[in-house]
Amino acid sequence: NVDKLMTFDMMGDLKKLCRKTISMQEGPHWYFQDYTMEQQIWWYNSLTEFDMLFAHNWKDVNYYRGITNKLVQKMPTLMLAERLGIIPRNEWSDAVMIGGNMVRWYGGFDSYVVAQHFDMPISAPSMGRKIDREDEMDIQHLPYMTWVEWIKTLSQYYVGVHMMPTHAAGTFTLNCAFHGIPCIGYKGLDTQEDLHPLLSVDDGDMRGAIKLAKKLKDYKFYEECSLMCRENYEKSMYTEERCRSYLE
């Protein structure tokens, strides 16, 4: 709760306890601009007092460097699937997983429109922003589940669609790549561009996304995208081994 944080000297107390103070981005870089004016100024001042900032995507790195003139580093989103005994898929059904619910934050409606072009059953995870009457659509809404349950369930899907305009950690596209599931999504999200380069479109380019959905019906193109995203995942900084090397 921001109001509660503002009741005490957060940065002063942190600097008394720590030699270095670091802030880790959570959510899109513009999120604080939905706060009250007083809260926005308080958070901006706090950002300028941290010794270093960690950010999700390179565009976030540039944003924070610009407004704070501080040291900002990219903190890759990390998957520890192998540690939990989770293995990539080896069989799946003809079904589409979209990446969120019917709210602007997730872009669920746009994902649904694109997903319809596969002529397959469509599923969606249940997120905290799920709205009333979503269950009336021809979408199978998964129950709330743990991450382990989610990643195992995702393995049974043919393709992912994630037209999410809110760029943050990028876990959905990352999870898809782990399983070798091609995922259509927006540029600007590093996990999307790094792992699914052939399936990344500009923000709002629904026409391009629909063209890709139709193109993925071609088995050779599908296999190319499937193998590419899995290989990209294995050599990316989103794995534990390579992330450790990157941070060192």
Language model regions located:
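Short acidic alpha-helix that forms the nucleotide-activated donor recognition element
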Residues: 146-157, 178
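A charged, aromatic-enriched C-terminal amphipathic alpha-helix characteristic of glycosyltransferases
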Residues: 217-248
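Short alpha-helical segment that forms part of, or immediately flanks, the ligand-binding pocket
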Residues: 151, 173-179, 192
